[in-house]
Amino acid sequence: MGIFTFEDESTTTVAPARLYKALVKDADTIIPKAVEAIQSVEIVEGNGGPGTIKKLTLIEGGETKYVLHKIEAIDEANLGYNYSIVGGIGLPDTIEKISFETKLFEGANGGSIGKVTIKIETKGDAQPNEEEGKAAKARGDAFFKAIENYLIGHPEY
């Protein structure tokens, strides 16, 4: 098993508490509205807390796929949320899981700084490859931007 770890940081004008609410507390309804590729988010096991598994159905390259998203930890007081992609058609065959450790911080002018550590764990002797890391980062950046744009466009939220 190989492990490829990288970190990323994004900034936004959206306040941390509001962004956290959209990304964690209301994610099941907000994400399909904000992220065009994601069609639905549904709980398949658990009560919404750590250990819960969610199925995200998405369209990628004209194909309907899904990934299984497992909640690892929720730290509302510190605006932290950890989860892993643990299965599904959207997970490459060589990947065991992709883990995300996320945290929001107060940014400039009332905005937010989002920090994430991503760990890609491969199966067997497969080696993590840089392209998978770049693709994961690009998807994460696009996801964050889509949520930001949704919140800016919906100030009543």
Curated annotation (Swiss-Prot):
Residues binding Ca(2+), per UniProt: 32, 35, 38
Binding site for trans-zeatin 1: 8, 83
CDD domains membership: Bet_v1-like (cd07816)
Keywords of this entry: Allergen, Calcium, Cytoplasm, Hydrolase, Metal-binding, Nuclease, Pathogenesis-related protein, Plant defense
Highest taxon listed in the record's lineage: Eukaryota
Family matches, as InterPro entries: Bet_v_I/MLP, Bet_v_I_allergen, Plant_def-hormone_signal, START-like_dom_sf
Pfam families attached to this UniProt entry: Bet_v_1
Function statement: Class II ribonuclease (RNase). Binds to cytokinins. Interacts with melatonin.
PANTHER family found in the cross-reference section: OS08G0374000 PROTEIN-RELATED, STRESS-INDUCED PROTEIN SAM22
Protein name: Class 10 plant pathogenesis-related protein 2F
Source organism of the structure: Lupinus luteus
Taxonomic lineage: Eukaryota, Viridiplantae, Streptophyta, Embryophyta, Tracheophyta
